[in-house]
């Protein structure tokens, strides 16, 4: 098994189960799960310069532009030069992918392809705890108490863009922006696409893929 550092990326539309898959990869293989959403929340909370820049867009329900999110993620990656990692939420655009190219070579890219109806159903059942970014699904990951965050006891909310009428627009936007990123990694031979309606059925194939690249840190596959 090669000892070089593994640099991986996960791509997928809202509701595709990226967060769950990332948690399992981190748990089974020891990769650092680097979520752009998590870093954005941390920087906004700490009122950093990049956090204040991002906040202006988020408050207007606009996408954070490439130059802001790229600056944020480059800083985080510089601090993790000696680690195996898995990027979640970055790169979202071709510009972000090209910026990532300048500091490292991506070894492995996972793209999750989930049917539209499944995504729509999942998102309509999704509730979040905004301060932490914790996500719950009423079907397969419900909170212990309905409408309440397990950790803080604070109320959960449903995002406006998770409501059915907004989902179709979000998915169209994702496809338009993600297509050139997917094509880029496909042309390099590092893209692996997984299709299905259930994360538990996709996961064994993801586990096998990573097992061929890096030694699992657990003797038994963890879910």
Swiss-Prot record:
EC number(s) per entry: 2.7.4.4, 2.7.4.6
GO terms for MF: adenylate kinase activity; ATP binding; CMP kinase activity; dCMP kinase activity; deoxyadenylate kinase activity; GTP binding; nucleoside diphosphate kinase activity; nucleoside monophosphate kinase activity
Binding site for AMP: 36, 41, 62-64, 89-92, 96, 170
Tissue: Highly expressed in kidney, moderately expressed in heart and liver and weakly expressed in brain.
Gene Ontology BP terms: ADP biosynthetic process; AMP metabolic process; ATP metabolic process; cellular response to hypoxia; GTP metabolic process; nucleobase-containing small molecule interconversion; nucleoside triphosphate biosynthetic process; regulation of oxidative phosphorylation
Residues covered by region (NMP): 35-64
One Pfam family of this chain: ADK
Positions of modified residues (N6-acetyllysine): 175, 179, 186
PANTHER family: NUCLEOTIDE KINASE
Function summary: Broad-specificity mitochondrial nucleoside phosphate kinase involved in cellular nucleotide homeostasis by catalyzing nucleoside-phosphate interconversions. Similar to other adenylate kinases, preferentially catalyzes the phosphorylation of the nucleoside monophosphate AMP with ATP as phosphate donor to produce ADP. Phosphorylates only AMP when using GTP as phosphate donor. In vitro, can also catalyze the phosphorylation of CMP, dAMP and dCMP and use GTP as an alternate phosphate donor.
Oligomer and partners: Monomer. Interacts with SLC25A5/ANT2.
Domain comment, as recorded: Consists of three domains, a large central CORE domain and two small peripheral domains, NMPbind and LID, which undergo movements during catalysis. The LID domain closes over the site of phosphoryl transfer upon GTP/ATP binding. Assembling and dissambling the active center during each catalytic cycle provides an effective means to prevent GTP/ATP hydrolysis.
Entry-linked HAMAP family: Adenylate_kinase_Adk, Adenylate_kinase_AK3, Adenylate_kinase_AK4
Protein known as: Adenylate kinase 4, mitochondrial
Source organism: Homo sapiens (Human)
């Amino acid at each position: 098994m090669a000892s070089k550092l593994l640099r991986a990326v996960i791509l997928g539309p809202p509701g595709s189960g990226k967060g769950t898959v990332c948690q399992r990869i981190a748990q089974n293989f020891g990769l650092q799960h680097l979520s752009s959403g998590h870093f954005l929340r941390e920087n906004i909370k700490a009122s950093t310069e990049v956090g204040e820049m991002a906040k202006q867009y988020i408050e207007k329900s606009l996408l954070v532009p490439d130059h802001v999110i790229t600056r944020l993620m480059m800083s985080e990656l510089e601090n993790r030069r000696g680690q195996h990692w898995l990027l979640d939420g970055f790169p979202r655009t071709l510009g972000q992918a090209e910026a990532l190219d300048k500091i490292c070579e991506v070894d492995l890219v996972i793209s999750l392809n989930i049917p539209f109806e499944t995504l729509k159903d999942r998102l309509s059942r999704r509730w979040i705890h905004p301060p932490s970014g914790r996500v719950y699904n009423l079907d397969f990951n419900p909170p212990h108490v309905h409408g309440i965050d397990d950790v803080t006891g604070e109320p959960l909310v449903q995002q406006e863009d998770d409501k059915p009428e907004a989902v179709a627009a979000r998915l169209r936007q994702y496809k338009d922006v993600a297509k050139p990123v997917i094509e880029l990694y496909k042309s390099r031979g590092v893209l692996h696409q997984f299709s299905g309606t259930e994360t538990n059925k996709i996961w064994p194939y993801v586990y096998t893929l990573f097992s061929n690249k890096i030694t699992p840190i657990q003797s038994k596959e963890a879910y």
